[in-house]
């Protein structure tokens, strides 16, 4: 790699009590040598392993490979960028529960070949740690080929585990972050985001993977088992299955979610070596397992305060204290007080 061209080669390894995640990636930021066009290539291997209440080992192994292009655009203005990519994933699970339609399966395998397209506009300025003006708006779609529309199989008589040998779905996400200086150094950040997952064939519906799990901050490991974690402070992190007494995510994961937040931020120190700011927030969101049960006005609400510390050697570290006003799915009382720890996460 020629020095000074900005190429990045990285090796990543993460481990916790129940997971291991290893990956390598390469980024070429000037693929065509003119307007910035970044080529990214990555390989990743994840293993989730833990024991259930009966002492049996539950295992999930995921391999993924992806290639993507991110290009800065000149139209409609210079703040826009377009991402296109392809991804291959394989899932192998043993004694690990996944919700396949109305059936829970514990052993099997599945493959996922998907296309990704994302359009974003980022005018939030040069400081990603403490923006004071502008916005970051993103829209993306992830989709697979519609295999079931061409293979002429009768999925109504097929076993649940056999329906998803090759996953088919489309997944749409929207997110808007807006920053405004209120007075002096006080900054208001407002956030709105949503996601929707579905299949092409009503006999298949949404797949058991790629679902949304809402709650807490999702700090440790959940992103490695075929799901997407969505933060909602004031509530517990989503469990591995969803649907427990502490969950706001339905059993088997959600196919629709909404989240809204408003944060007031005030800088304590903006030194180059350490940036520190305090914040207070209002937040609301929820997750649903079907469009029929979707209600955008039925939100789980919370309020809280926190602090963020950014240091180059450690990245962004944060502590939030939150109170959830609403009941969980199977709870009888408000969620109550929660303390959240964050590390290099954008909520």
Regions found by a protein language model. Name each.
Residues 265, 302-308:
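Short glycine-rich, acidic/polar surface loops and turns
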Residues 61, 168-172, 298-301:
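Short, glycine/acidic-rich beta->alpha junctions
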Residues 73-80, 182-188, 271-273, 315:
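Secondary-structure transition into beta-strands, especially the periplasmic turns and strand N-termini
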Residues 99-268, 280-281, 288-289, 343-344:
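C-terminal outer-membrane beta-barrel translocator/porin domains of Gram-negative envelope proteins
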Residues 1-136, 234, 240-241, 317, ...:
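Gram-negative/organellar outer-membrane beta-barrel architecture
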Residues 285-302:
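Outer-membrane beta-barrel transmembrane domain signature
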């Amino acid at each position: 790699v020629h020095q000074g061209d900005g190429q990045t080669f990285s090796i990543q390894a993460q481990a916790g009590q129940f997971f291991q995640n290893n990956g390598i990636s390469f980024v070429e930021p000037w693929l065509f040598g003119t307007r910035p066009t970044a080529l990214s290539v990555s390989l990743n291997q994840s293993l989730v392993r833990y024991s259930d209440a009966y002492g049996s080992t539950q295992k999930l192994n995921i391999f993924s490979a992806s290639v993507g292009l991110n290009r800065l655009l000149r139209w409609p203005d210079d703040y826009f960028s377009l991402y296109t990519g392809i991804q291959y994933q394989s899932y192998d699970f043993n004694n690990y529960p996944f919700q396949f339609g109305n059936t829970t399966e514990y052993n099997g395998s599945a493959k996922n070949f998907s296309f990704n397209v994302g359009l974003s506009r980022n005018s939030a300025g040069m400081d990603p740690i403490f923006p004071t003006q502008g916005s970051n708006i993103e829209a993306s779609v992830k989709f697979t080929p519609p295999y079931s529309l061409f293979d002429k199989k009768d999925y109504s008589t097929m076993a649940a585990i056999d329906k998803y040998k090759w996953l088919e779905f489309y997944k749409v996400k929207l997110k808007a972050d807006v920053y405004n200086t209120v007075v002096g150094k006080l900054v208001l950040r407002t956030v709105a985001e949503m996601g929707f997952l579905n299949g092409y064939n009503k006999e298949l519906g949404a797949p058991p993977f790629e679902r949304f799990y809402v709650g807490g901050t999702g700090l440790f490991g959940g992103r490695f088992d075929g799901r997407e974690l969505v933060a909602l402070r004031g509530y517990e992190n989503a469990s591995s299955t969803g649907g427990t007494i502490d969950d706001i995510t339905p059993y088997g994961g959600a196919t629709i979610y909404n989240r809204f937040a408003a944060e007031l931020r005030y800088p304590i120190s903006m030194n180059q070596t350490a940036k520190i700011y305090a914040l207070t927030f209002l937040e609301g969101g929820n997750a649903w397992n079907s469009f029929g049960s979707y209600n955008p006005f039925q939100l789980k609400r919370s309020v809280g305060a926190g602090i963020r510390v950014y240091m180059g050697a450690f990245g962004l570290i944060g502590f939030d204290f939150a109170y959830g006003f609403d009941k969980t799915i199977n709870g009888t009382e408000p969620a109550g007080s929660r303390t959240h720890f964050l590390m290099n996460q954008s909520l």
